[in-house]
Amino acid sequence: MGTRPLLRCRRTLAVAVLAAVTAAAPGALPARGSSASAAAPAFDTSPAREALERLLPSRADQFTLVPVEEPPAGASFSVSGEAGAVEVRGTSPATLLAGVGWYLERVAGVDIGWPGESVQRLPATLPGVPATLTRSATVRHRYALNDTDEGYSGAYRDFDSYRHDIDVMALHGVNEVFVPTGAEYPYHQALQEFGYDAAELRRWIPAPAHQAWWLLQNLSGFPDPVSEQLVEARAALGSRIARHLRALGMTPVLPGFFGTVPPGFAARNPGAVTVPQGKWVGFDRPDWLDPTGPVFGRLAEAYYRAQRQRFGATSMFKMDLLHEGGTPGPVDVASAAGAVQRALEAAHPGAVWVMLGWQTNPGAALLSGVDRSRVLIVDGLSDRYDGLDRETQWGGTPYAFGAIPNFGGHTSLGANTGVWTSRFHAWLAKPDSALAGIAYLPEGTGGNPAAFDLFAELAWQPGPVDRQEWFAAYAARRYGGADPHAAAAWEQLRLGPYSGLSGTWSEPQDSLFTARPSLTASRAARWSPTAMRYDPDTVERALAELLRVAPALRTTDAYRFDVVDVARQALTNRARVLLPRIKSAYEAGKLETFRSLVREWSADEELLSRLVGSDRRFLLGPWLAGARAWGGDPAERDRLEYDARSILTTWGGRVPSETGGLRDYANREWDGLVRDLYAPRWNSYFARLDRALVTGTAPEAVDWFAVDDAWARGHGTYPTEPTGDPVSLAGEVHAALVAATSARVVEGRAGRVRRG
């Protein structure tokens, strides 16, 4: 105790001295204690300090942050120091945080994940660093967030939520983040100079949860007009997000302008030529303004001017021409792409155009029309298919190794981590490699923390990662201490959900509990895997091991999240065993067997609802409360709630939902959804099958869209705080699974005896 004030004084003195000197000359991280010229520091470390105080409020004062000029080789950090006095040297505020993150994991043995943390296990005095830790990024671009992230992760969050996510991304070495929040603002402002009034434009702009697909030129105007106050509030939030990123030395990646315009644009603007874009899964796509025509440059200038005035300048802009079925019509694609890039260059000289590598985009014609040195393709398919040669396909255009381990914000556990660790460094080492970054692109974030942790680390490891060693180390820090049962649990998860193979899918299967009721259901979302992608026993074994973790570690936030998540996945996987048995009983006309199995299914869904209700990150209530909080009056609150409910269920109107296949695309096992939508759907369906067995008639048909749409338009409230004990409820799941397995064994033996 007696040494603490002295340590604190030393740290205060160190910070004061460092603020008056320059960081080391470019080329290397200076050795600790080396002299520096009496000039201004390389950058202001206070944003990193403030982030530390948010993330580690009672330990932040034990870190000294030293700014260092970034050498041509790129970002780097080093960590050294004695107990209670840890020095981190880095080339940006965000890189300083990455150094802190490396220290927390490698020295202090705790985790700040996305989500879940174990910092409560830190000792009062932080441990010293036995040997200096040094890391340099192997790639310049460390990009995060899918175009759809805001829609599927929550379009109605507040600044504190976004700031926390950015702080955590920085802690894991990310330096470029897509910021779509408030993207409607420059359209709303610029298009008023081209014949539209504000009210018209607010009818064209979609509500926040659906806005990502408007930016991708897939739809417009759904579900209701947005208000002036909402446009303004979102612009204010987006501006704060961009400022926070800049303060940390990170790059906000803003949506660029590539020609999306409202109906009737050509009629109001002589000389303009627009190309109808047809339909996107049932939605009318917005028109595309020909970038080679005389009006495009003027509109692009107005757009970028309004954007810069509100959001500030940046150096990276996201644009995807002809996304998912867009058509160029008579427009020459190469010329159009060149015009789009020239407009960007005029507004932001030297800016990088970020494109998504998805399906066949970007095509050779598009790339032939641009300066490829100022393009970055964030590849959404790096881990999905085999036989990829991006250098040949994209003609040497710089690209980022990317992954989409989650679609629609599904709560499924797992990822193709073995593909990541085998491919990334192999692609980087190719003689003609154009690999320039990583891109973490799940459609929804806030789950699968091990996947994010491992993927982000690829950019900071000098060579291939040994997955077995990595997961063992992850288990040792995740709950703030080494534990043999935690290690065994994560080894099972590595062997199971986190060993997905390439070839077809990049995400795990979704849940049958969330699927539209059918005896032949194999997935909930139309584009999800139709079968298990791993041995489900690995998850049950992992759950059994997690429940044996030492009591002291069970109090951590990370453990409580993980035990719910793993128990949820284990219970969910059982549905794929149970549903075929229900189908067999129904088709065989075995009423009592059918009823018994249906009772098991219903009991599992009831238990699932209670389980996920024990962790706030699996609650529907905050999602809906957040949406309503953005409304300026009761009517707007109701409209925004529908926006938030519909994206999770019907997604759109009847045609996009049913014919287009978007229904349940964003399914997730959240309390509220399970209890009030998914379970009642299955109960209603099974009741109809039961009546059909009793009466010998065909089951009554159901208009499931009407059922889902009624729920989406409802206004029932849901808990915003968890209830129940996560560990006890996970234990209930384990007991139920053990009992079910035992019952199947007994049933199998009885069947063999009868046959004998």
Protein language model features and the residues they cover:
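C-terminal substrate/ligand-recognition segments
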Residues: 529-554, 564-587
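N-terminal structural segment of carbohydrate-active enzymes
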Residues: 139-182
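C-terminal amphipathic alpha-helical interaction region
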Residues: 578, 583, 591-748
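Secretory targeting and sorting signals
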Residues: 2-36
